[in-house]
Regions:
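Flexible glycine-/small-residue-rich
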Residues: 33, 42-44, 61-63, 113-117, ...
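Conserved phosphate/anionic-ligand binding catalytic regions in large, soluble enzymes, centered on
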Residues: 27-29, 122-141, 328-351, 433-453, ...
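Mobile "lid/hinge" segments at catalytic clefts and subdomain interfaces of large enzymes
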Residues: 140-260, 448-547
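Flexible, glycine/charged-enriched surface loops at secondary-structure junctions
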Residues: 103-109, 144-146, 213-231, 263, ...
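Single-stranded RNA-binding regions, centering on S1/OB-family and related RNA-binding modules
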Residues: 290, 552-556, 563-697
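Long, basic N-terminal domains or extensions that often function
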Residues: 1-232
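Extended amphipathic alpha-helical scaffolds
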Residues: 1-45, 49, 53, 230-369, ...
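Glycine-rich, flexible beta-strand/loop modules in the N-terminal catalytic cores of phosphate-handling
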Residues: 25-109, 115-117, 122, 188, ...
């Protein structure tokens, strides 16, 4: 039976239709927020997937171009692969949902959010997030919901709940928070150096709004929810763990994992696995899950070491950062490069500068964003973790890590007017043992400074982890988690920022939420750590941006012209501007406001191009001096081209102070001559004189 539910949310109406569409899905809802419409569905397989030791959850966020009245580009005129925004939104939805499914659930689950219309006042990402949580909670799929999500913007210091697309894009804060009834379960933020106290305030304002959404969901689930279905547990049998502990004691496992060298630890675990496989040779059902069982045994051992003994696997103190190193100019000839090393995590970042014509073009649902000037890309090759694998391009993880490090630096980048370049930073993972995205932030910051990009402040990033006990008060926050602590811990809380404030946050967890004291402690720990990284490591490699771009980087000169004269510079079908480019070997960009950027590597050629543009756009007042080329000779005079596409005439009587009978007696085609402007005639044509040029010219 079709039912409709509504609530007021941040000054707009949120409407949920249940039973109207997609009856064959486990859960479905057509959701409208303002006039933004998203179809959210969830489907689970009947049986668990064989041979997997993880929960196979897939989250999709489909951006349909008809939602904004567009026909997709390309030959087929249909949507292709997911955009970067769609991938990032899918990841943000996945992170709070995944911890709320049973840990021993192995059925395939697909969450799909299809954007069908977009109201610029109501962002579709918010609707998809709410829809995913709602349809899963009301479905028959095992899920410990509900959870809810809210976005927060900030303009002039004032918070704005679920801001419009325009406010979200231009404001000082882009914060997304997911909550359960009592705890925060996910945080994603980009910020313009916001102080830690202000960020915490914003997080818990979102949390409060989430409680009203959860109450709304409770009403819907009470009327339309389905009983949860039974499922086959894939948990490791208790008797198997007992048998393992007789062969490999907890002390043996602790000794195996207690080393600061990742490769040694992995070798120790392989030996333990081989020993257990030999002992369980006659138990096929145990051999099938032995890898997962050893993983769980490691996990219990590491968590006990940290929580009860305050002993980390590599011997560090709870708040201690791994050994750090930083250097710049590692790679010759590139525009800027830097390498940042933290323990066994190592990132090399390379920056490339280009004219603004090379900005990334974006054709998405947000009409306010059509280009991206700063691009950060992250690569994670198999060799960085000692594996063999063919590279098949960036996956969702690589795109997500690249976007986080990009978000971290956006707040400190110079404006286009201050620095008229497109900027690409590429982080190459040389070695990985946790927090490569935070190392990418540090490396890209240094590479930008080495490239001569005048960033406003230095930015660093660090991640905190968490191990929890049986109660909310029983926990330990870890500074700078390595890979093992990430895998076996409960939290990965990444924060980037300057000395002034936070520029980005990404928090994802494996438990059912964090209390406020944990959130506050994690943010305080990351602040202390990033100050140390900037002051004691990064600033000793490079303390401020270089005053000029590198020798191999293109140079850019900017001038302003009258917008009404842009057509004169461009010429008919681009003839004039193309001739300037051909003569001087430069690139020229002109905005609608008349800002002209000339880009090249030869300063003399660039100056020549600037002179041509200035000449073309001059008002040709009487007395101006020009140098030009004779391009045509007539009986009555000669035509002088003084700039591409610009000609004036010297009458025969104005060629020489002495009387001449023929123009050819003095001038030939191709001659370079200096002329003085006499003004324009009634037809608007420019008149020149050679004989009246002042002697000092």
């Amino acid at each position: 039976m079709y039912k409709s539910f509504s609530m007021e949310l941040a000054g707009r109406t949120l409407t949920v239709d249940i039973g109207r569409v997609c009856a064959q899905a486990n859960g479905a809802a057509l959701i409208k927020y303002g006039e933004t419409t998203v179809l959210s569905t969830v489907v689970a397989s009947d049986k668990p997937r064989d041979g997997v030791d993880f929960f196979p959850l897939s989250v999709e966020f489909e951006e349909k171009m008809y939602a904004v009245g567009k026909i997709p580009g390309g030959f087929n005129k249909r949507e292709g692969k997911a955009s970067e925004n769609a991938i990032l939104t899918s990841r943000v939805i996945d992170r709070p949902m995944r911890p709320l499914f049973p840990k021993d659930y192995r059925n395939d689950v697909t969450l799909n959010n299809m954007v069908m219309s977009v109201d610029p006042e109501c962002r579709p990402e918010v609707v998809g997030m709410i829809g995913s949580a709602l349809v899963t909670t009301m479905s028959d799929i095992p899920f410990d919901g509900p959870c809810a999500m809210t976005q927060m913007g900030m303009v002039d210091g004032e918070f704005i709940v679920n801001p419009s697309q325009k406010v979200w894009d231009k404001g000082d804060l882009q914060l997304t928070v997911a909550s359960t009834r009592t705890k925060v379960i996910m945080i994603e933020a980009g910020a313009n150096e916001i102080p830690e106290e202000k960020m915490i305030e914003a997080i818990y304002k979102c949390h409060d709004v989430n409680q009203t959404i959860i109450q709304f969901m409770d009403k819907i689930v009470a009327e339309c929810g389905k009983p949860k279905h039974e499922y086959t547990s894939c948990a490791i049998p208790d008797e198997m763990f007992a048998a393992m502990k007789e062969i490999v004691t907890p002390e043996d496992m602790e000794n195996a994992v207690f080393t600061d060298e990742k490769q040694k630890r992995e070798e120790n675990i392989r030996e333990i696995t081989d020993k257990l496989a030999e002992a369980f040779a006659d138990k096929e059902e145990w051999l099938a899950v032995l890898g997962e069982a050893v993983y769980q045994y490691q996990k219990k051992t590491v968590r006990k070491m940290i929580l009860k003994d305050h002993k980390r696997p590599d011997g560090r103190a709870i708040n201690q950062i791994r050994p750090l190193a930083a250097e710049v100019d590692l790679i010759p000839r590139v525009h800027g490069s830097a390498m940042f090393t933290r323990g066994q995590t190592q990132i090399c970042d390379v920056v490339t500068l280009a004219p603004l014509s090379e900005v990334q073009k974006i054709d998405g649902l947000d009409a306010n964003i059509t280009t991206k000037r700063y691009i950060h890309q992250y690569n994670f090759p198999a060799y960085s973790v000692g594996e063999t694998k063919v590279s098949r391009g960036p996956g969702r993880r690589e795109i997500g890590h690249g976007a986080l490090a990009e978000k971290a630096l956006v707040a400190v980048l110079p404006s286009e007017e201050e620095f008229p370049y497109a900027i690409r930073a590429v982080s190459e993972t040389f070695e990985s043992n946790g927090s490569t995205s935070m190392a990418s932030t540090c490396a890209s910051c240094m590479a930008l400074m080495a490239a001569g990009v005048p960033i406003k402040s230095m930015v660093a990033g660090i991640s905190c982890g968490l191990v929890t006990g049986d109660t909310d008060d029983d926990y330990i926050v870890l500074t700078d988690i390595q890979g093992l602590e990430d895998f076996f811990g409960d939290m990965d809380f990444k924060v980037t920022g300057t000395h002034k404030g936070i520029t980005a946050i990404q928090m994802d967890i494996k438990i059912h939420g964090l209390t406020r004291p944990i959130v506050e402690e994690a943010i305080a720990r990351t602040r202390e750590a990033r100050f140390y990284i900037m002051d004691e490591v990064m600033s000793k490699a490079i303390s401020k941006p270089r005053k000029e771009v590198g020798a191999y980087a293109p140079k850019i000169i900017q001038i302003q012209i009258d917008p009404n004269k842009i057509g004169d510079v461009v010429g008919q079908k681009g003839k004039t501007i193309n001739e300037i480019i051909a003569r001087t070997d430069v690139k020229i960009d002109i905005t609608d406001e008349g800002a002209v950027s000339v880009c090249g590597t030869d300063k003399e050629k660039m100056a020549e191009a600037i002179d041509m543009i200035k000449t073309i756009t001059t008002d040709f007042e009487e007395g101006q001096i020009f140098t030009g080329t004779v391009v045509s000779i007539k009986e009555f005079g000669a035509f002088i081209e003084f700039a591409p596409g610009k000609e004036g005439m010297v009458h025969i009587s104005k060629i020489s102070k002495e009387r001449i009978n023929r123009v050819e007696d003095v001038l030939t085609l191709g001659d370079k001559v200096t002329v003085v402007c006499l003004g324009k005639d009634k037809m608007g044509r420019i008149s020149f004189s050679m004989k009246d040029v002042p002697e000092n010219n």
